[in-house]
Amino acid sequence: MLTQESEDLLKQIEKLSPDFFYFKSNSLVYRAILETVNPIDKIALVSLLTALNTNNLIRQLGRLETIMKLIENSPASNIIYEYSKVILDNYVKRLLLKSGDSLCLISCSKKQITQSVITSVASQLTIAYEILEDEGTYTLAEIFASLLVSLDTKKKISINSGIFSGFWQLDLITNGFQKSDLIIIAGRPSMGKTAFAINITRHIIKTSQYYVILFSLEMSTEQLLRRILAQECHLNSQKIQSGQLTNVEWQRIVEESKILANLNFYIDDSAEISCDIIKVKVKLLRLQGKKIKLIIIDYLQLLQESKKSENRSQELSLITRSLKILARELNLPILVLSQLNRNLESRHNKRPLLSDLRESGCISKFSHIMWSHVSKPLFNFSIKKSHMHNFNKNIYQLLDQGEAFISRQDKKTTYKIRTNSEKYLELTSNHKILTLRGWQRCDQLLCNDMITTQIGFELSRKKKYLLNCIPFSLCNFETLANINISNFQNVFDFAANPIPNFIANNIIVHNSIEQDADLVIMLYRESYYNKEMEMEDMTEIIVAKHRNGPLGTFQLKFDANLANFLNV
């Protein structure tokens, strides 16, 4: 069958692996077929026999007659789909049997069962699940056909594929939370991040049939339920906790509890959890028929990384990347709450910037920063609103825009990177550099990486502290020559706004974890810092990043007693 000419045959070959075959002889023949398959013509029998003979596989299979017998008894190619389905089905069954054996061994073992052991077994089940999913590589014709059908359906019934938050101004900007998007809700403590997420959750589970799961790494399930009941019953959560309730209030709680109990909402309050465990738990729920449509994680900084890194900053970078990959794999939005860098507390203007969403990456105090066509070292830098050079990746140009905020940090180990043209920069391991491979941390740079630099400015030994340069608009790429440990020294944290990157020693640097996010929403309440404000209950919602749409700012009313946000 596999040596007959068929377009369907070539499509099915992409879905099958040699490991799917039970008999070794079939696996060896199929592996040889994969090596000789021609996407234009049918699989040539002569080429197949030559490949088997070259790899000394004919002897392993027994004799040439065995192969000829397989060919003679092969059915027509028009039923290739049914045969491939049988092969896949039997392979999945063997995987399930293997998982069952593993469970039996674990159950009979005297060793303590750990979460990692359970995760390992669950991973075997998810592999079986993924094999049955119809995923692959598609042509543009197939993609456009699917897209046009989807758009036509939306046009006819006037629906949006996004998941709406219930805050009309936010939904107007975002058009709903989209599938495969990583959404970060950020703010300093006491801004109401968890309350905001609960508001969104309540709206979704009450107005749709969507399943939502919330991974709470900070609050227990009981604490979260008290908050939800407080919002639903319009009662202070502290009053619910104390139990000092009137008969009317108690009856209200009972009625709302009955309604909430029937909604499609799951809470997981595991203290330590990683992206891998989240993936397994969501896929197991899907296997049970629970079509999870939204994942909420409270909050980012408490997530664990399966592969331990040298420092927490590197772990967070890996976690956000893993979350984005998970959102794409599960084809759903993931909403993650995140703390902002505490350095903004030292600024006069406490309104958060996109660059505050990071673990601090620092650079040497001797680094020269480009500012209004002038370069100054950090230790001689005076902050003022002026033009600072940023890199705009959309037009691939260096522009004069933005302002900066600097804070002095403790001593840290720095590394010196140097290009072939002798450009250099001293920075901590978690600071990011723009390369042809995208933004890369210092500890992830490779020799011969192409580093993005600016054109038109060179450090001058004669003008050490103040260097004039000509205006520039283009950037250049230079080869990374070496990276060495430099010194244990005082460093500075440098934040840029509105684009979270800047130019130091001619090299474009960046230290934000927001690069993996599709949507970044920041919460800010001026009255938290200014107690004399009249509108003390107003919270500013800042859409600071929107990969697929506009930015925007609007206000919501915050009820501190109920920890509840309201449209205005």
Swiss-Prot record:
Its EC number is 5.6.2.3, 3.1.-.-. Keywords: ATP-binding, Autocatalytic cleavage, Chloroplast, DNA replication, DNA-binding, Helicase, Hydrolase, Isomerase, Nucleotide-binding, Plastid, Primosome, Protein splicing, Repeat. This protein undergoes a protein self splicing that involves a post-translational excision of the intervening region (intein) followed by peptide ligation. This is Probable replicative DNA helicase. GO terms for cellular component: chloroplast; cytosol. A replicative DNA helicase, it participates in initiation and elongation during chromosome replication. Travels ahead of the DNA replisome, separating dsDNA into templates for DNA synthesis. A processive ATP-dependent 5'-3' DNA helicase it has DNA-dependent ATPase activity. Coiled coil: none annotated. GO terms for molecular function: ATP binding; ATP hydrolysis activity; DNA binding; DNA helicase activity. It catalyses: Couples ATP hydrolysis with the unwinding of duplex DNA at the replication fork by translocating in the 5'-3' direction. This creates two antiparallel DNA single strands (ssDNA). The leading ssDNA polymer is the template for DNA polymerase III holoenzyme which synthesizes a continuous strand; ATP + H2O = ADP + phosphate + H(+). It is found in: Plastid, Chloroplast. ATP binds at G187, R188, P189, S190, M191, G192, K193, T194. SMART domains: HintC, HintN. Homohexamer. Residues 156-424, 308-568 form the SF4 helicase domain. The keyword Phosphoprotein does not apply. Belongs to the helicase family. DnaB subfamily. Pfam families: DnaB, DnaB_C, Intein_splicing. One of its GO terms (biological process) is DNA replication, synthesis of primer. InterPro entries: DNA_heli_DnaB-like_N_sf, DNA_helicase_DnaB, DNA_helicase_DnaB-like_C, DNA_helicase_DnaB-like_N, DNA_helicase_N/primase_C, Hint_dom_C, Hint_dom_N, Hint_dom_sf.
